[in-house]
């Protein structure tokens, strides 16, 4: 008698809010029970199938690929893939079902089965035992490929149900098979499954009723239990089906697009031709021999691995962007490639940098290289639509991102499902929103008014812990495109994205890596938009024709500005953590900037590399090298490994790793905190280094640094790509501050700083800011010349909250035909409605036509009255009404309410006497305060950051009328005074002043909320980004 069984109907947690176990948990349990195979049949999706495939391989248990579907007004079926034709048919069916309805839903019709779907086996899951007519239709449609699924879950009438189903199968002459309708790997997940069901139906568990399964039997049961429930023939039948389902994802064969290659060329010869053209463009006087050899080596490897079409595809996208004058730049590991530089994809000159091509691609890697290209964020859509036009929507789609449950969302969903009232849900999420450890934050709960011993609270937290990390839904990748020669839905299902004119495949980037599909990342970067806008402004107003390539390099005033941490608004080094590092590192060259970009990251910090590097840079510590070979690797960073490439090179040079093995080490570094896998490298490194004469202490030190890189260390090539934009933005801020500030505001939202902070910084740099004025303002902020000085910034109509761009464009067109005589003339010629005119009046934009705000609002109201019932009739002259001029504080309040900023006095100027009475010093006063002295400071909160580099420390930026103050809030104080920390707009800090050279900050000891002093003024703060 055959003792085995194959489960043919099983949901993973990629049946969102239904399946209560991961694929790995399911396969591990199935292997433990002695199953012969396991089908993963998530509902109308293959989103989790690659993970299931990897889980199956990890336990050496066959995976059967399938999907549960429900026909509209019809039966529930389970479709199982027999071979590659069946896989393609299933992908096409899911695509059709998902594309014909909105995101997150599907629709399958009986007509979808009018044509045969070869290679699919069909299980029918009847809801009643007398569905004879339904069975006849299914038999006629699927014939010999149809089975009746018998599902027994220890209900009161299992035996009667079994007999009736077998009788139905016999009557219809359909073979019957045992199946479990599995929703979880173990019975212990029942509470989570019930909770997820309640979440899905938007009801509390207590009211879910028959929506819940009656017991916990929908788990992977032991063979002994199954033999008690089912006749052996039904269990044996499961094995017959399993033996027929032989398809493996490894059989998929992806083909690159071919239309980019002219008929007279092969892909290889065409790539070489384009590269040679690029060499002539990049190096008009000829490239160095080492660069030409690097290019030849790369082209040889690209041809050997068959990736020519990938490079041609990326080149084509970049070519289109450059022709449309869209700024773009490749980054990431692709910047290690000399071929990418020659093709114009990246901007890191291999003649000036040490490249590690193996970081980008190597013979040992089992997937294509990954090229990321940033485009202007405002024009990226043009590039995306070009790709769709070029390849068609059947051959191009965006990659999915699997959105997973984090603590805050999981707590809210679980607490709501368990019936907690909204105020308690909010308080609980506030207490535990950043909870990541297995142990609940008991003290936080007590502070929030909760009893940690409460059984209900314990249940909420237990279920939350199980739910964290579960997939919640698929969302759209920011710009990862999959492009293929064959229709994509022969490889993976495609569905609608939430955004119009977008389609996404059901796999994410990790899935693509696993099965070897090409992905091109077409990403958006706000700083590229700002730089392009700045170039446009300089061309229009300053008659300068600049580009990224023509910005003067190695400019001393620019580096001096950077070393002072005068970097508000620039790229990458604008955060408080970066600003605090700049006066310590004091960059003097481009390579210093590369290091600056990379060093303020969790990897170098947690690997203990930052302080040794700074000490060596400041000649406080001697440079030492374990060997001459490693000196070559580490010399450029003073003997301290700061980059991923250096760690890989150390493994190659000191421990005899091959380049491909070094790349596997990099991957293990990136994933060890989530998945482990570094320990084998520890032994291998130690053995290899010992063999080559390195001490055990050095091997242990390197391994600890490698673990630090598991917390996000930068590749050098990526840091160099970003440093190019860092330098460009800094040069523009230093030499063309008005155009740069203007471009930043016009490109907002982007970066760390609000328009208000950018304008306040511009004023501190003695730039003239002119108010919004319908007589001069365009939609965007603009420049107005001042003889012999930096131009003034004219605030644009975009600054007015709620004002429409189309109204601004109407004003521009009307003004081009002649100046406005008064408010009525403006309203009539620009076609403005009452709402638009009121917004202009409140924002002070009618000052030049009507006087102050009160008078402007009065005139707008009068114009509307004339345009109302009495339009066209003679109007009586109304005497002038004496309206009071707004006070300074009234103007200040209305400025912030309508514009988010003010050109009047800073709010703290008006409060300075009150703050002095509270013993608060200004940021200017602090310049004279000695290190270690106790001080009190108050300011508007413009930023709160809790970076991963900081071990729970929160950095707060306070702004007053003279500048900014950096505040450090240690974790214990942040926990004790959390409400004040996160809720204050005007914050007083009592603490200890610290200064070391140009590095200054306040260590907080006590926080006080002074927000009521603002009388309702609201200031924007960038929090926890």
Swiss-Prot record:
Give one Pfam family, short name only: PHP
One Gene Ontology cellular component term attached to this UniProt record is:
cytoplasm
- This protein's source sits in the domain of life called Bacteria
Enumerate the InterPro entries for this protein: DNA_pol3_alpha_NTPase_dom, DNA_pol3_finger, DnaE2, DnaE2/DnaE/PolC, DNAPol_HHH, NA-bd_OB_tRNA, PHP_dom, Pol/His_phosphatase_N
List the EC numbers from the record. 2.7.7.7
Subcellular location field: Cytoplasm
Q: Which UniProt keywords apply?
A: Cytoplasm, DNA damage, DNA repair, DNA replication, DNA-directed DNA polymerase, Nucleotidyltransferase, Transferase
Specify the enzyme's EC class, one word.
Answer: transferase
Q: Which GO biological process categories is it annotated with?
A: DNA repair; DNA replication
SMART domains, A to Z: POLIIIAc
CDD domains per record: DnaE_OBF (cd04485), PHP_PolIIIA_DnaE2 (cd07434)
Name the Gene Ontology molecular function terms of this record: 3'-5' exonuclease activity; DNA-directed DNA polymerase activity; nucleic acid binding
The reaction(s) annotated as catalysed by this protein in its Swiss-Prot or TrEMBL entry are: DNA(n) + a 2'-deoxyribonucleoside 5'-triphosphate = DNA(n+1) + diphosphate
Per the record's keyword annotation, is Cytoplasm included, yes or no?
Answer: yes
Q: What does this protein do?
A: DNA polymerase involved in damage-induced mutagenesis and translesion synthesis (TLS). It is not the major replicative DNA polymerase.
**Which protein are we looking at?**
Error-prone DNA polymerase
Cite the source lineage. Answer: Bacteria, Pseudomonadati, Pseudomonadota, Gammaproteobacteria, Pseudomonadales
User: Which gene is annotated as encoding this protein in its UniProt record?
Assistant: dnaE2
């Amino acid at each position: 008698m055959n003792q085995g069984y194959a489960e043919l109907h099983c949901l993973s947690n990629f049946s969102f809010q239904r399946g209560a176990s991961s694929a790995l948990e399911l396969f591990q349990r199935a292997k433990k029970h002695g199953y012969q195979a396991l089908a993963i049949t998530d509902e109308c999706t293959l989103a989790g199938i690659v993970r299931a495939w990897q889980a199956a391989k990890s336990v050496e248990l066959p995976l059967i690929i399938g999907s549960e579907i429900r026909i509209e007004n019809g039966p529930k079926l389970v479709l199982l893939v027999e071979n590659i034709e069946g896989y393609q048919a299933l992908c096409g069916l899911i695509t059709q079902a998902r594309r014909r309805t909105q995101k997150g839903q599907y629709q399958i019709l009986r007509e979808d089965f009018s044509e045969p779907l070869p290679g699919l086996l069909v299980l029918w899951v009847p809801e009643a035992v007398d569905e004879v007519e339904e069975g006849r239709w299914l038999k006629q449609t699927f014939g010999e490929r149809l089975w009746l699924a018998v599902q027994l879950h220890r209900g009161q009438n299992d035996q009667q149900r079994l007999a009736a189903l077998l009788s139905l199968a016999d009557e219809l002459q359909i073979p019957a098979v045992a199946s479990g309708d599995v929703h979880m790997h173990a019975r212990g997940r029942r509470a989570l499954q019930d909770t997820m069901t309640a979440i899905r139906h938007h009801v509390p568990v207590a009211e879910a009723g028959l929506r819940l399964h009656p017991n916990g039997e929908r788990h992977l049961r032991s063979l002994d239990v199954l033999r008690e429930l089912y006749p052996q023939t039904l269990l044996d039948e499961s094995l017959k089906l399993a033996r027929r389902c032989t398809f493996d994802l490894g059989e998929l064969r992806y083909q690159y697009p071919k239309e980019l290659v002219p008929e007279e060329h092969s892909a290889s010869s065409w790539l070489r031709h384009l590269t040679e053209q690029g060499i002539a463009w990049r190096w008009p006087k000829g490239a160095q021999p080492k660069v030409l050899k690097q290019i030849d080596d790369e082209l040889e490897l690209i041809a050997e691995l068959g990736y020519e079409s990938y490079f041609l595809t990326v080149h084509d996208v970049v070519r289109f962007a450059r022709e449309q004058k869209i700024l773009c730049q490749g980054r990431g590991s692709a910047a290690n490639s000399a071929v990418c530089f020659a093709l114009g994809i990246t901007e890191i000159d291999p003649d000036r940098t040490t490249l590690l091509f193996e970081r980008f691609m190597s013979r040992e890697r089992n997937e294509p290289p990954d090229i990321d290209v940033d485009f202007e964020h405002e024009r990226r859509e043009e590039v995306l639509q070009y790709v769709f036009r070029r390849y068609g929507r059947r051959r191009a789609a965006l990659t999915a991102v699997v959105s997973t449950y984090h603590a805050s969302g999981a707590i809210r969903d679980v607490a709501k499902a368990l019936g907690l009232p909204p105020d308690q849900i909010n308080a609980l999420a506030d207490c535990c929103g950043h909870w990541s450890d297995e142990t609940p934050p008991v003290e936080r709960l007590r502070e929030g008014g909760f009893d940690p011993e409460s059984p209900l609270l314990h249940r909420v937290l237990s279920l939350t812990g199980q739910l964290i990390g579960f997939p919640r839904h698929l969302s759209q990748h920011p710009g990862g495109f999959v492009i293929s020669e064959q229709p994509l839905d022969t490889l993976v299902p495609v569905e609608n994205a939430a955004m119009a004119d977008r389609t996404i495949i059901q796999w994410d980037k990790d899935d693509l890596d696993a099965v070897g599909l090409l992905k091109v990342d077409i990403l958006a970067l706000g700083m590229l938009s700002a730089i392009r806008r700045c170039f446009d402004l300089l061309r229009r107003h300053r008659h300068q024709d600049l580009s990224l390539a023509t910005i003067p390099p190695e400019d001393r005033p620019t580096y001096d500005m950077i070393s002072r941490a005068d970097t508000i608004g620039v790229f990458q080094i604008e955060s408080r953590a970066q600003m605090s590092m700049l006066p310590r590192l004091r960059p003097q060259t481009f390579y210093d900037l590369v290091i600056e970009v990379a060093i303020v990251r969790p990897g170098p910090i947690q690997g203990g590399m930052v302080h040794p590097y700074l000490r060596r840079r400041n000649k406080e510590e001697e440079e030492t090298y374990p060997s001459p070979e490693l000196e070559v690797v580490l010399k450029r960073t003073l003997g301290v490994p700061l980059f991923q490439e250096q760690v890989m090179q150390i493994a190659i040079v000191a421990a005899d790793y091959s380049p491909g093995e070094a790349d596997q080490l990099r991957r293990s570094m990136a994933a060890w905190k989530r998945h482990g896998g570094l320990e084998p490298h520890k032994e291998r490194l130690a053995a290899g280094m010992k063999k080559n004469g390195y001490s055990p202490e050095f091997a242990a030190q390197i391994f600890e640094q490698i673990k630090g890189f598991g917390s996000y260390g930068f590749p050098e090539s990526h840091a160099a790509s970003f440093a190019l934009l860092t330098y460009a933005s800094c040069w523009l801020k230093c030499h063309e501050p008005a155009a740069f500030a203007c471009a930043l505001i016009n490109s907002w939202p982007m970066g760390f700083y609000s328009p208000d902070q950018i304008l306040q910084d511009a004023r501190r740099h003695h730039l003239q800011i002119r108010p919004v004025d319908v007589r001069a303002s365009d939609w965007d902020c603009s420049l107005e010349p001042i003889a012999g000085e930096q131009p003034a910034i004219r605030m644009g109509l975009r600054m007015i909250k709620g004002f429409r761009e189309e109204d601004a464009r109407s004003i521009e067109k009307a003004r081009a035909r002649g100046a406005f005589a008064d408010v009525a003339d403006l309203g009539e010629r620009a076609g403005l409605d009452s709402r638009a005119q009121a917004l202009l009046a409140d924002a002070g934009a009618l000052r030049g036509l009507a006087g102050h705000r009160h008078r402007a609002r009065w005139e707008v109201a009068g114009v509307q009255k004339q345009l109302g019932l009495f339009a066209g009739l003679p109007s009586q002259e109304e005497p002038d009404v004496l309206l009071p001029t707004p006070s300074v504080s009234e103007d200040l309040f209305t400025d912030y309410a309508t514009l988010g900023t003010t050109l009047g006095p800073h709010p703290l100027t008006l409060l300075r006497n009150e703050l002095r009475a509270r013993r608060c010093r200004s940021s200017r006063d602090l310049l004279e305060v000695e290190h270690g002295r106790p001080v009190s400071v108050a300011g508007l909160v413009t930023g709160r950051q809790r970076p991963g580099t900081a071990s729970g420390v929160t950095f707060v930026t306070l702004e007053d009328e003279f500048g900014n103050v950096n505040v450090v809030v240690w974790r214990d104080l942040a926990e004790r005074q959390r409400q004040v920390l996160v809720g204050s707009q005007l914050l007083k800090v009592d603490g200890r002043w610290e200064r070391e050279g140009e590095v200054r900050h306040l260590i907080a000891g006590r926080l006080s909320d002074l927000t009521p002093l603002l009388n309702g003024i609201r200031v924007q703060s960038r929090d926890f980004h």
